[in-house]
Regions:
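Short alpha-helical transmembrane segments in multi-pass integral membrane proteins
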Residues: 2-44, 102-169, 211-266, 320-324
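Signature of the first transmembrane helix
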Residues: 38-99, 103, 267-287
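Hydrophobic residues within alpha-helical transmembrane segments
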Residues: 45, 49, 83, 123, ...
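Small-residue-rich hydrophobic transmembrane alpha-helices
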Residues: 74-134, 171-190, 299-324
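Helix-terminus/linker motif at the lipid-water interface of multi-pass membrane proteins
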Residues: 56-75, 144-151, 207-213, 277-308
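Alpha-helical transmembrane segments of multi-pass membrane transporters/permeases
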Residues: 125, 180-203, 217, 221-224
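Hydrophobic/aromatic residues within transmembrane alpha-helices of membrane transport systems
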Residues: 49, 61-65, 77, 102, ...
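Generic alpha-helical transmembrane segments of integral inner-membrane proteins
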Residues: 48, 52, 56, 60, ...
Length: 327
């Protein structure tokens, strides 16, 4: 990730006196000059590749847990899906809203405003991440039982989520900054951050599960550690003063207009993810009643396979215009 970062250099269009002062910075502003069709390909394909890689990891994660811990652990892992998806929903709430606001500010040439959005994203993710962690750590067992856990699977789901919740703030920051990274003109760098997380995860998973004998907790720790490493790369990027968007004094105070804008724009993807959580909860409860723990585990595996094929089809679809241009 860090090596690929150094290779991700993009030029930007010249503007007024402000850009003269920013001439040494390498944050791209080609969004204002490049063809929309080309930008669509440049931004959509890296995003879908990253999501496809994440789907592949989720399948590998299930394989490691299934062979290293057992089938009931797969069922316990499946029970955590609504909680994981809910955490992702909060990540989308901030990430989608912030990335849109950053794009708008850059389009308006309000670069100071874009930096304030970056600072608000960091603080807002920490606040929401801590609140999410506190609430669900206090109510974890009742929530898991409501999701369809049984006496046979509750320990696996609890062990996994306890570790994930410890690193939940990291997850929120990672998702939020990756969205801003993409919208500020670095779609490939955002993809590299995700791919780095996936690769590290796949390396640590078998080491922690089979090598150290940590069981399902090992898989959770692999997830948290991989996100910490990717987040470190993002923080290094935004800490570089030569970048157009970078951390500096005066951008971390929450502004009501920025927070409202982020939440308003991000509410739609948040509600979509929330609905997906509710659907999975209802299905898991029905499967527990009529099929038992193994049925919940089987449904969790099917979910991962289906999502992988959705990502592959999306990648084929978005690359179609490019292939037509080549013809």
């Amino acid at each position: 990730f860090f090596i690929l970062y150094k290779k991700t250099k993009v030029t930007f269009f010249s503007d007024s006196a402000y850009l003269c002062d920013m001439s040494k910075q390498n944050s791209p502003l080609v969004l204002g000059t490049e063809r929309i069709s080309k930008l669509l390909t440049q931004y959509a394909i890296p995003a879908i590749i990253a999501m496809t890689a994440s789907s592949l990891y989720n399948m590998a994660d299930s394989i490691f847990i299934g062979h290293g811990v057992g089938p009931l652990a797969i069922s316990g892992l499946a029970l955590t899906f609504p909680l994981m998806n809910l955490a992702a929903a909060f990540g989308s709430l901030v990430g989608v809203g912030a990335s849109t606001l950053v794009s708008v500010k850059l389009g308006q040439k309000d670069y100071e405003g874009a930096n304030k959005v970056l600072g608000n994203v960091l603080v807002l993710n920490v606040v929401l991440g801590l609140a999410f962690t506190l609430v669900f750590m206090l109510l974890l067992d009742p929530i898991l039982y409501f999701f369809g856990a049984s006496e046979n699977t509750i320990s696996y789901a609890r062990d996994y989520m306890n570790v994930i919740l410890i690193g939940n703030v990291i997850t929120h920051m990672y998702l939020g900054l990756n969205a801003v990274l993409r919208s500020s003109g670095f779609p490939k760098l955002a993809m590299y951050a995700t791919l780095a997380s996936v690769v590290i995860n796949c390396v640590l998973n078998p080491l922690f599960i089979f090598g150290f004998g940590w069981g399902i907790k090992g898989s959770a720790w692999a997830t948290v550690i991989s996100q910490v490493i990717s987040l470190t790369g993002q923080l290094i990027h935004f800490s570089r003063p030569k970048e157009l968007l970078h951390f500096k004094k005066g951008i971390y105070r929450l502004k009501s207009e920025i927070v409202k804008g982020i939440l308003y724009i991000g509410m739609s993807p948040f509600l979509m993810n929330l609905c997906a959580c509710l659907i999975v909860i209802l299905i898991n409860r029905g499967l527990k009643e009529h099929g038992g723990d193994m049925a919940i585990g089987a449904y969790g595996i099917v979910n991962r396979v289906v999502f992988l094929f959705i990502m592959i089809l999306s990648l084929i679809h978005i690359s179609e215009p490019t292939r037509l241009q080549l013809i």
